[in-house]
Amino acid sequence: MDKSEQDQLKKEAATKAAMMVESGSVLGVGTGSTVAFFIDALGERKEKENFSLKHIVTTSNRSKKQLEGLGFQVDELADIDQADLTVDGADRVDDNLDGIKGGGGALTLEKNVAINSKKVIWIVDESKLVHHLSGFPLPVEVLPVSAEQNFKRFEEEGLKPQWRLDDNGKRYVTHYGNYIIDLAADPTPVPHGLADYLDHTVGVVEHGLFLDMCDEVIIAHSDGTIEDKKRK
């Protein structure tokens, strides 16, 4: 499958998600190539229908600029009580609809938007599907003051930590001024147990395990089909 065919599949999946958004609702919007098609589809609805949104919050400047370019006003998460729906991508999704996110470094905001949403839908292509969470480093955002100690503890736990670096080879700094340690242990060991360990580790701000958060995944398959999978 070439890129144009893959993009067409992503567009179809994104359009399906866009049709699930109710006019007048509060919407959370993630980021990524498939989400970009989703935003375009929202713009088409705005142009062709009597479609508007009460509030929109997003997890990236890229999505914010795209939305504003289509005439949508983007608000801060602090400006809303709760999103009716959040649509985002994912780096990996397992059979239970649990996932790894944060490959772009915005995991803390992504999780805050997701946790403050009544419903969460992820749009992915089939390359992101796994039976057990694996094949993608798990990002952990840590405070600089205790980052070295966190790194050593992760090493001792056999989690194969790696500093995330920027384009200049320096430690990547998040929007909130923190570092990211990517855990390369593969497959991700006992996701719920690891999440609990990270949640109780001093210095950890947030991690990329999104467990029991996603309600529905729209999947673009290479055979041209679009699958809608819901949490059981």
Curated annotation (Swiss-Prot):
Family classification: Belongs to the ribose 5-phosphate isomerase family.
Catalytic activity: aldehydo-D-ribose 5-phosphate = D-ribulose 5-phosphate
A GO biological-process term: pentose-phosphate shunt, non-oxidative branch
UniProt pathway annotation: Carbohydrate degradation; pentose phosphate pathway; D-ribose 5-phosphate from D-ribulose 5-phosphate (non-oxidative stage): step 1/1
Keyword Lyase carried by entry: no
Function per UniProt: Catalyzes the reversible conversion of ribose-5-phosphate to ribulose 5-phosphate.
InterPro entries: NagB/RpiA_transferase-like, Ribose-5P_isomerase, Ribose5P_isomerase_typA_subgr, Ribose5P_isomerase_type_A
Lineage, top ranks: Bacteria, Bacillati, Bacillota, Bacilli, Lactobacillales
Entry EC number(s): 5.3.1.6
Record-given protein name: Ribose-5-phosphate isomerase A
Domain of life: Bacteria
Active-site residue numbers: 110 (proton acceptor)
Complexes and interactors: Homodimer.
